Every structure is written in structure tokens, then in C-alpha cells.
């Protein structure tokens, strides 16, 4: 967006004072065109500025006339144009100063309103600055030539006035510098213009590095190549002028000018050798990779030589890279710290593409020699680089030119499990390094706001979405990385985060670092959840406590999706259950990994669960997820088979055997307070429970609830051999005893499943009575069962595990689930009514 595009959105009252000497109506007609002219860079009253100002006045009048005619406003605009010409015709520099003041005021107003200027405006201003400097430089070269020719002609005839050959004066006498002074000033202008090009090269390199974290990047080097080539042309012209004026210059002055020109050329040539295609910044040994370099001045200096120079690629350590950067000029050579195969290619000119480049297509790092690391630094924190080097001779004197270019820092790994930590090192270095730094120095602590920008860019680039993170997401991430439950975004604005907090310190109560957890979310979202995130169906970065505050007062079946806080690369469904008394319970279903979602998609899993009704806040789930449902295949397939499908259920939703008064109270208490365990089951027509099992009328008095956060137990009768289990009954979480009065035990101690000995029906003692006298049911009243296997008992101990992996006991109905149990009271929650999502 242009500067005027933002100005037009602001209140006119804030801008009225800017348009006193130049009507706002004319500013509106000129719009973006006005910003594309070098008003801000014509500072001074010399001939160059005067000529440019006159040209701008004429162009402004023509632009206004054309725009007014196109919009049919000629009659109302022509008087303004006439006034403009009458005021500024005699002094066009005054128009330049007026519009420069308006643009500066507009920029200040935009920064106050929007906090930053538009990116395209910045780029255009930088381009205008260089174009103006180059134009001024070319003008000075012409002046120098005229002055030299005047001196030489005057020396022959003695009649030519130098003053008449230089540009006519504007306000007062013209320039009176002699040739040496003018040449020194022109070389100074060349050095200043070269500094603009070198800065632009550094900006390009920095943008290339930031692109590794997802920042948009304009990779084309065509514009930079044109700038470098234009400066080489100026260099050649000045070199000719100094040579032609050797008789008019003192030897010392001439030598100084030549030395300065040579330094300009050397710096320009060595700086124009760039790594256009960077090698992977996380580089695995024995893996092929590509890289490429570009010589911006190759077309001018290499020509069409029969034998192009060869470019070599070598691996260097951080210490070697630092020594190279501090050396005066390119080094003679370095010892490679790794063995790279296929590491030499020719540097060739390509006329069709108008570039000089070398592309390494089959590089392979065979092995790496590790160096001594600093302190507690791990191998995934050790940074290296690829050094690209070449040399060629220049000019009739065969001047040897050596070119070197360092790649961005990279981390070498030998195993895939090092990839995650290596990416953290690269992410930190790319985001927080400075231009012109000593390789590869980077800050140990950075502002949290910069970290938020980095995480947001990385997330959008890695996932491939235009939907970034929201303020609520950053609040949750800050709470996580700082281990601070502050509920205000402002509490973290001025804090700094360290490298150790980012990827060295283990998060409290977890087995992983902040980056390892965040990278797991990136991978899961990229592989399985991109479309869900882009459709804003996933809140994602939100704590369980905040989930409770959002869902507690919502209708039954309201749910949302959040990334697991205690597992790497998991997403869970949190939903509200309302009891008949109106009380609420928030439950979190066991997280799904990328592997789970590759078996059955998230949308289909949500469709499978009937208890999920509305996506928070009030969007029906079918409306929200319909586009993510997989069409169900009906009937037979091409081979005549009836189609099957995999569907998800929550184990709590499976029916329980219904007790009858004739039967003993040998029923597993159902743990309604535990986190439901999502399981995959093939659809079946088999009924459950089996029809042969009689139902109980009541369980209320005989049901025993196990305490929370303990291993599931089986409560057994005194006689361990008097146990039978109904066929196909779900594995019990507890067996309640039923005894005769004379053998009653008031409070039997629960026993672990592993302590119980199960026997087959043939080993059971004969019944000695009927219910409710306390005896166990005979074979004809309750079908005999096969004893549970070791696998069954293992499943019993493992089922209904919490998200953190601990065993959970039974919970009363409508109490918060242990999986999603809140650690703070609702009075401490951030109960914002309008979150960003």
C-alpha cells in the first residue's frame, strides 16, 4: 500500500495543517505519483538540484492536467494549476521544499497512527535515493570533463573562460573550484554512492537470511547488478579523466585520486560475489544438496574467456569464518573442516539470462570434523559455513583478483533426531543476528516482542497459511516459556527471553523444551491441520484454564480444539458436559498425533462423536466441518465386497451391563470423572451387552468409587476363588463384593489387579444360597466367563490414562476431568468476552 493509501484512511482534521501552501485537492489528484519523485533527496541549490526541480515542476503540471481531464474536473482544477505555475515558475526549488515538507508530515502522521510506514513506500524511497545520487554523480562527471577540457583549451589559446563553460549560475556566482578540487569531490560522490550500493547488498543478504524463517523475500539480483555496473562505468570515466588531466594535476594529488578509485573498485568487485542459492542450514552428512553463487560484475570483467575461473566450496568453522571476516582482503586459503564431494564448478557467463554464476548441483558432505565447543554448547549449537572462493586476473597487467563468499551459518547433523535442536539454533541466528556482525555472533537474550514476530512468521511459512497467531496465542506462549501465569499481555511486553529458555531448559513438569514443543505443533499443523487452521477452526494455543473459562457456561456439547500442552505434536478436543442439575464438566479427549490423523482425519473424528454439537462459540459442527468430512462409501465396492469404515468412539460412551436385583453386585464402577480415551473400532452389527446377561435394577448402594489419581483396583471377596466374569463384559475397574452377613467385611482393602488370581468356572465353589444373602451367583443364573488374559489386565491398568501419563481413579459425575483439571479457580481466569477468535 502507498503512503497516500494510508493517509486517505485518516481523519482529515489531523492533516489540514499540512496543506497550507499546496492544496489537498491537488495532493489527492497526484496520489501515488507524487511519492515516486525524488522530492526528499534534492537538498541544495546547485545546478543539478535546480535542473531537477524545474523538470519536476513541468512534470507536476502535466500530471495534474492529464488527471483532471480524465476525471472531468478540468474547470475546477485549471485555476489551481495556473496558481501553481505562477508561484513556483521562478523558483522551482521552493516547490520541492514545499512538497518535501508535506511528505515528511504525512510520514509522521502515518507512523503515529499505524506505527510503521508501508513496505512498498520504503523500497521506492531507497530506489529514489540511489537514482538521485547516481544522477548527481553523472552530472559531476560531466562538469569535471568540461572543466578539464576548458583548462586544456585555455592553455592552448589563452582566451576561453572557464566560467562560461560550466553550468550557468542560479542565484549568484557559479562554481569556482579548480580541476583537482572538482575531481576530489567527484570521487567523494562516487564513494558515497558506492556506500548506498554496499548497504543495499547487506540488506539483500539480511533479507535472504530472514527468509529462512519465513519472511517474504525478493530474490532477484538484477537491480543490484545494474547498480554495480553503473558504478563501474562511473569508475571508468573518472579513471579516464584523471589520466587525461595528468598534466594539470600534481603527482601527489593524482596518486591519491588513483588510490581512492582503486579502493572503490576493489571493494565493489569483492562485495558483488554473493551466495545466490544458500545450502541447507541444517545439513546432514551423506546427503546431497545444492548451492549457487553469483558474480554481479562477471559480465564486465570475465567476458567470454576460453577458460572460466573455477569456484571451490569448503566447509569452515565459526572460528575460521571470523578470521576471514577480520582479515584485510581475501585470505590465501583455509583448511576445510569437512570433506565435501563434487565441490568445484566453473564460474560462467550466461548471455540469455544476463548473469555470471556457478551452480553446485551435487554437493555432498561426506564427513565433518568437530571443533572444540564453548561451555555447555551441544553439537547442534555448533555453527559452520560453506566458503565459496575463486580467483581471476584483470586487465593488461594481469592483476590477481580473489573472490570469497560465506554462506549463512549452518549446523551439521549426523542423525535425524538432531534435526529439531539444529533448527532451533538456525531459527535463533536467522532472527536475531545483526548486519555486518562478526561471524556468527548473536544475542543471548532478545525482547519477547521480537520472539513473537519470529514465531508468527515461522508458523505461517512452515504451515503455509496466511492466518497468523493472535494476541491470545502469544499470551499463552509467554506463560509457557516464562513459567508465569500472568493474565495480561502487557506483563510480558518488556520482558526478554533467553536462548536457554527457548531451547535448553526443560519446561516445568515436562520432558521437552519450549522449541521442541512448538516445533511439534508446526509439524502437526503442516502435515494434517493446515486447512482447519486456515479456516479458523482451531484455537490451538490456549491453556486448559482458559478453556474452562470459555466453555464452562456454554451449552452441552460445545467444544473447541487446542494443541496438547503436555505432549509434543498433539491436538485435543475439549468439550463441555452438562448434568441434569445444570452443573458443568469440561473434558479433554486424548490428544491425536499426526499418525492418528493419517488414519482418520480430524473432521471425520469430530463427526463420529455425537456428543460434540457446536464449535465454540455457537457454530454447529456440521456447518463448521462439513467441507472437511470425507464422503462415506455406501454399498459394495468394485469387487463385490461390502464397504467397511473405521470410526472413533470415546470409551466412556460404550454401554455398561445393566444390573438386576437377582444378580450379585459384581459390577465394575464406571469412572465418570476420568478423561475419556479415544479408541478406533471397526463398525459392527454385534449387540452389546450380550442378551444373556440379566440386568440389575439399581447400583446406587453397591457402587464404590475409587479415589482420584490412584491405580485402578479390584475390590474382591474374601474367598479369591469365588470370582466369575461375564463374557464380553468390559474389563472391570473394580469388582464389588457381595457377602453373607456372617462373613461380611465392613471395609475391605482394595487390591491391585496384579494381586488378583483369576480362575476358570470349573474351579468355583458351589453356591450356598441366593441373593441377597451374600453368596455368589451360580452358573445357571450368570453365564461363566473365560478368565482375563495378561493382555486384558495390562489394558485395564493402562486405560483411562491422563494426558500426562498418570493413572487416574474414578471421579464423581460432573466433576472436572483430571485430564483437563484446572489448577486455579475461576476467579483468577482471564474472562474476556470477546477473544480474537
From Swiss-Prot:
Spans annotated as Disordered: 802-837
Annotated ranges, domain SH2: 517-632
Domain of life: Eukaryota
Keywords: Acetylation, Activator, ADP-ribosylation, Cytoplasm, DNA-binding, Nucleus, Phosphoprotein, SH2 domain, Transcription, Transcription regulation
N-acetylserine modification, residue list: 2
Keyword Transmembrane: no
Modification Phosphotyrosine, positions: 641
Major localization class: cytoplasm
Modifications after synthesis and translation: Tyrosine phosphorylated on Tyr-641 following stimulation by IL4/interleukin-4. Tyrosine phosphorylated following stimulation by IL3/interleukin-3. Dephosphorylation on tyrosine residues by PTPN2 negatively regulates the IL4/interleukin-4 mediated signaling. Mono-ADP-ribosylated by PARP14.
GO biological process, any: negative regulation of type 2 immune response
Protein name: Signal transducer and transcription activator 6
One annotated Gene Ontology cellular component of this protein: RNA polymerase II transcription regulator complex
Function, in words: Carries out a dual function: signal transduction and activation of transcription. Involved in IL4/interleukin-4- and IL3/interleukin-3-mediated signaling.
Database matches in SMART domains: SH2, STAT_int
Protein's organism: Mus musculus (Mouse)
Subunit structure: Forms a homodimer or a heterodimer with a related family member. Interacts with NCOA1 via its C-terminal LXXLL motif.
